[in-house]
Amino acid sequence: MEVEDLGQHISRRFNEDLESVRSAVLKMGGLVEAQFDNAIKSLAEGDSELGLQVAQDDYKINRLEVNIDEQCSRILATRAPTASDLRLIIAIIKAITDLERIGDEAERIGVLSSRLAGVERPSTNYRELRNLASHVQLMLRQTLDAFARLDAAEALKVVKADDVVDEEYESIYRQGITFMMEDPRTISRAMDTTWVARSLERIGDHCKNICEYVLFMVYGKDIRHTQLENIEAEFAPGGKARERGS
């Protein structure tokens, strides 16, 4: 085989490896989204069996995380990627950890939903919980879209939306405390509702993390622990950041 042909062969195999691992991440993301949607459906409809099924299916996400991690390790060991390819592999390794943790939180919501099934819930508190769940569902959908398309603008939307989710969680937490103080009989129910809200808030955090990795892939800049106003100044349309292709 000629040297030039060998180089093209190696390059083609490398691209196939990258596409394979990228496809596996998208498959994992789809499974995580399905698990989360089922957990929220269980909560909304009081479906105890569906909530427990979410918990039972969490192992599928864990298995995918291990497989993708092994794929990435092989690529790092055998292909020695550089520049944008290296950023992609690093971001994938980090992103699958956050996806797995979203799966864990979906499992937790499923278990809590099964406990809350058939239990009377305070209308105001539960309405806010459903609003929070809807916002986090949108965040997760936008996160997966941003990752699939390497869409920096969509990723920035998610980073900004996390502050709203945090505020909604704090409101639900304060209401839960109020309910427990006013009527000690509601303590168990209020605690479970608050833990669901806490899991939703954590899922929002993991979505934000993944979108920060998207910005890292596109621009080559690590924005963790950076103030939101500085992120917007850097990455919003007309900002200072420029895409890095190498």
Q: What are these model-predicted stretches?
A:
Residues M1-S246:
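Cytosolic, long alpha-helical scaffolding segments
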